[in-house]
Curated annotation (Swiss-Prot):
Residues 1-22 form the signal peptide. This is Uncharacterized lipoprotein SAUSA300_0413. InterPro entries: Csa, Csa_sf. It is found in: Cell membrane. Belongs to the staphylococcal tandem lipoprotein family. It comes from Staphylococcus aureus (strain USA300). A lipid is attached at C23 (S-diacylglycerol cysteine). A lipid is attached at C23 (N-palmitoyl cysteine). It comes from the Bacteria. Its main location: membrane. One of its GO terms (cellular component) is plasma membrane. It is a lipid-anchor. The lineage of its organism: Bacteria, Bacillati, Bacillota, Bacilli, Bacillales.
Length: 266
């Protein structure tokens, strides 16, 4: 009788051991799968800022804090840098882009930046660059430099950043993206095909001269730590380009960094 009890106990222990080991392996596999999903990590990294879109009143950023790391000094509330530009190839070997960058200092609750117009040439010619200083008060862009061109003046004063009208909360539903990784930098990229029915695409077509019916590609790029960093680069691009050698896209970024003196080095 004692032998049978020991045998039953041994069998129970063996079954439980197999069950526990199986659960551990399943857990490890699930965890590994989760860790290996760089596409998901990239989307989650972007979601920290994109979930705030659309930011109709940019002054709300004065009361929002981003990711803080050791680069911030004690007491520094940080600075948001918001950027949007429209780039296009006018002809072979020439690229123009036009847009705005604005620095919102949470310490002083002031926002300054500039509107830029640039043309780049492939050979034998330096780029043309024009910067027009601006500031923002009461969620309104104020032009500080004198601009004779009335059309350009109006364009600057009425400028809206992509983040002010975009809605990318459905980003989590995008899947099967084309992912590329360079661990040495590190840098991470993922691309998704978009539909012309997408409201963000419709908004861009209504605001910019986009002479193509081609459905765009959403490109997400990160330089630096996926979990968050005040150092590195993070940008979103909606690319309408028809072919490899042409360029037609809208680039957007919203970054949080230690407050610093603005520099027109864009």
């Amino acid at each position: 009788m004692g032998y049978l009890k020991r045998l039953v106990l041994y069998i129970v222990i063996m079954v439980m051991s197999v069950f526990i080991i199986g659960c551990d392996k399943s857990s490890d596999t699930a965890e590994k799968s989760k860790e290996d999903s760089k596409e998901t990590q990239i989307k989650k990294s972007f979601a920290k800022t994109l979930d705030m879109y659309s930011i109709k009143n940019l002054e709300e950023l004065y009361d929002k804090e981003g990711y803080r790391d050791g680069e911030f000094e004690k007491g520094d509330k940080g600075m948001w840098t918001i950027y949007t530009d429209f780039a296009k190839s006018n002809k072979p070997g020439e690229l123009s882009n036009e847009g705005m960058v604005l620095y919102l200092d949470r310490n002083t609750r002031t926002a300054k930046g500039y509107y830029f117009v640039r043309t780049f040439y492939r050979k034998d010619k330096l780029p043309d660059r024009k910067n027009y200083k601006v500031e923002m008060k009461n969620n309104k862009i104020i032009l500080l430099d004198k601009v004779e061109d009335k059309k350009l003046k109006q364009k600057i004063e009425n400028f809206k950043f992509f983040s002010q009208y975009a809605n990318l909360k459905e980003l989590k539903n995008y899947s099967n993206g084309d992912v590329s990784i360079n661990e040495n930098v590190p840098s991470y990229d993922v691309k998704y095909k978009m539909s012309n029915k997408d409201e963000n695409v419709k908004q861009l077509r209504s605001r910019y001269n986009i002479p193509t019916d081609k459905s765009p590609v959403l490109k997400m790029h990160i330089d630096g730590n996926l979990k968050g960093s005040s150092v590195g680069d993070r940008k979103l691009e909606i690319d309408f380009s028809k072919r490899e050698n042409s360029h037609l896209s809208v680039i957007d970024s919203l970054d949080y960094q230690p407050a610093k003196t603005n520099k027109d080095d864009e």
